[in-house]
Amino acid sequence: MTNRKGWIVTLAGMGLNLALGILYAWSVFKKQMVAPVDDGGFGWTNQQATLPYTVAIAMFALMMIPAGRLQDKLGPRIVAMTGGLLTAIGLIIASFSSTGSPLPAVIGFGLFAGTGFGLGYAASTPAAIKWFPPEKKGLITGLVVAGFGIAPVYISPLTKVLLGNFGIAMTFRILGIAFAVTATLFSSMIRNPEKPLNVAKPGVSKTSFGGDKTWREMVRTPFFYMIWLQYAFAATAGLMIIGNMASIVTSQSGGALKAQAAMFVALLAIFNAGGRVIAGVLSDYIGRIVTLALVSISQASILLFFPRFTTFGEFIVGAAVVGFSYGACLSIFPSINADTWGTKNMGLNYGVLFTAWGVGGVFGPMLAARIVDATGSYQTAYNVASMLLLVSFVLAMLNYVQVEFDMSQREVTIRLGAKKAIAKVVAAKEEAA
């Protein structure tokens, strides 16, 4: 019965995130908003059209902290439902945007929907994880957050059809009403178990540092800051592409792939979702840090080639690698959080860690928008993001290869991840005279 209830909560969390994932479809709205007024757009600059998305990301990240505390105290159902309703209201407010100012979109999509994203997202993952043993953290986290990643698969083409038939304003209103219904339905099924299932199988460690930690204890560890930086760098690179994918395809193809731009947004979303599930399962077997290092170096490599992409096939490869790598991080980091600092306070703890995603999410899209407005090219932004991911790879390696010194015993111990020592060097003790 417990497993059945746990899977219901997991699928409900995935469903809620499937609705909240409208954030990742913003590039379709942006493409229409920067279009000339004669073509049904607003004639906004890239920076104006990116601003609501950037504000939404910032609010998303900032709200994860109070939302995490609220869901730890009040339970996930109330928090998730409130988040869903705020997102719906925000979409309706955004429908009042016009050629004159992006303010309604900034207030509606940025502030209201961004707050809703944070509340809903903070409630879904911790609740699902608490229903399962530690060795399934990666799988369950991946499944729940996959809903957020795969959302553009249906939202992007749906939004494109709605924009073509009803225009920007009515599209926001239709999506807002639909969102209110679906988010309320899924939120009603999300709840915590009476007691988290923290019993691991023999040989499986419950947490790396032994027991549940508060956020204050968490931020006192050097490991937290290394992980925070890696999360920020991954978000910078991933959201830079996700938030501008339709525009990137249209621009770098010289307009040849303009009609297929929304398809690439959906393709990126498929790999985004796949990365969350596959990397979650993979990290359960080979370790979180190793998986993180692999996706960091993969994404860094592909971004070096992105400026040269102009054809259909090249953009497929680019969308696949970036989507998978970014999605992988969104399941690896919550799992690292639960492994290291426990599940009791995970809502608040992960909210604090999630500020890294917010910083990266604000920096990445706005950097790309500023650069393309100034130079007409994304190349410099790609190079910066690739360098950040290389730093993330190095940090992951430093986390994985640990060297411990015991001066009293004259020992040097080398460890790989959380495994037993692979080498131990003991200095010869001096014989007593």
Segments predicted by a language model, with ranges:
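Extracytoplasmic gate region of multi-pass secondary transporters
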Residues: 26-33, 216-279, 364
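Intracellular juxtamembrane helix-capping segments at the cytosolic ends
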Residues: 33, 119-133, 140, 328-341
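Interfacial helix-cap and linker-helix signal at transmembrane-aqueous boundaries
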Residues: 33-34, 70-71, 154-166, 249-250, ...
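Central cavity-lining transmembrane alpha-helices of secondary-active solute carriers
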Residues: 51-69, 266-278
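C-terminal ends and interior cores of transmembrane alpha-helices
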Residues: 85-99, 298-310
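Hydrophobic core of transmembrane alpha-helices in multi-pass small-molecule transporters
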Residues: 102-119, 232, 314-328
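Helix-loop-helix hairpin linking two adjacent transmembrane segments in secondary transporters
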Residues: 144, 148-194
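C-terminal transmembrane helical hairpin of 12-TM major facilitator-type secondary transporters
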Residues: 237-240, 259-336
